[in-house]
C-alpha cells in the first residue's frame, strides 16, 4: 500500500511541473505577441480568404 501511495504522489508532482512549464511558455508567447509585430498579421488578414479554391484562382474571396 505504501508503494502505491508513493507512486501516486510522484505522478502528481510530475503533473505540477508540467503545468508550471506550460505556464512559463505561455507567458513567453504573450510577451512576443505584445511586441510590435501586428502589422504583419494585419497584412495577412487583409488578403482575405486562404481556402484552396481561392488560392487556385488567385482570388482572395470565396
UniProtKB/Swiss-Prot annotation:
GO process annotations (BP): cell differentiation; chromosome condensation; spermatogenesis
Region (Disordered): 1-62
Cellular location(s): Nucleus; Chromosome
Alphabetized UniProt keyword annotations: Chromosome, Developmental protein, Differentiation, DNA condensation, DNA-binding, Nucleosome core, Nucleus, Spermatogenesis
Tissue specificity annotation: Testis.
A GO term for molecular function: DNA binding
Entry GO CC: nucleosome; nucleus
Main location: nucleus
Superkingdom as given in the UniProt entry: Eukaryota
Function according to Swiss-Prot or TrEMBL: Protamines substitute for histones in the chromatin of sperm during the haploid phase of spermatogenesis. They compact sperm DNA into a highly condensed, stable and inactive complex.
Family from the record: Belongs to the protamine P1 family.
The protein's name in its UniProt record: Sperm protamine P1
Naturally occurring in which organism (per UniProt): Planigale ingrami (Long-tailed planigale)
Taxonomic placement: Eukaryota, Metazoa, Chordata, Craniata, Vertebrata
Amino acid at each position: 500500500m505504501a508503494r502505491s501511495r508513493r507512486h501516486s504522489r510522484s505522478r502528481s508532482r510530475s503533473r505540477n511541473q508540467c503545468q508550471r512549464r506550460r505556464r512559463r511558455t505561455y507567458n513567453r508567447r504573450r510577451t512576443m505577441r505584445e511586441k510590435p509585430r501586428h502589422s504583419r498579421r494585419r497584412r495577412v488578414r487583409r488578403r482575405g480568404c486562404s481556402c484552396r479554391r481561392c488560392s487556385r484562382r488567385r482570388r482572395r474571396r470565396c
